[in-house]
Amino acid sequence: QEEFFKAAFAVMGHVAKAKGQVTKEEIQLASAMMDRMNLHGEQRRAAQDAFREGKDSDFPLEDVLVRVKISTAGRFDLLQFFLELQISAAFADGSIHPSERNVLHKIARGLDFSSEQLERRLQMQEAAFRFQSQGGFHGQHQGQSSGGSWQQASQADQLADAYKILDVSSDADSKTVKRAYRKLMNEHHPDKLMAKGLPPEMMNVAKEKSQEIQNAYDLIKKVKGFK
């Protein structure tokens, strides 16, 4: 667990450095990630040290990824969580720089994910970023009284993003949507990830991810009238 934890922040530092200089915003983003994990004292210092190590020009990315695979016993769910953590950190400013994308492809390869699998996860994360910034499903209830046409456009955009979060096409039937939802929830269930060795500090991030999947599914069900 400690190996996984340190590697996660070191690789985050490496991704942040991909654009050249690590900006103040990226350091704030790393701090925000530490806040999401409720890291304080010694744990926070360990995360900060790891992030700094990742910024070194001679950071041994491939070696670190090999250690991550060993520490997780190659468990798909944990490796996916690790990759998605890097994607969400890279997306925290709203977009992905080409050099960040290149590093993410290296990370994906090192964890035995194909380029196609990475690109799909990038699309899912981009949709999730927009979905959350617009308030997700729960924001829908609050905006219904203001501006009907804006609301329709906003809901159409959110619905499109909800389908992307579940990685299904917008004409998918209720069975297909439910199957995709169950698969993603099974892979991202916080308790299952913990049982497989996810560091407890990362439980909050896992909960946020599963809530995101739940919100996307709830919106599709509501708009499409799926049971």
Tell me what each language-model feature is:
Residues 1-14, 24-188, 194-227:
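Small-residue-enriched hydrophobic alpha-helices in membranes
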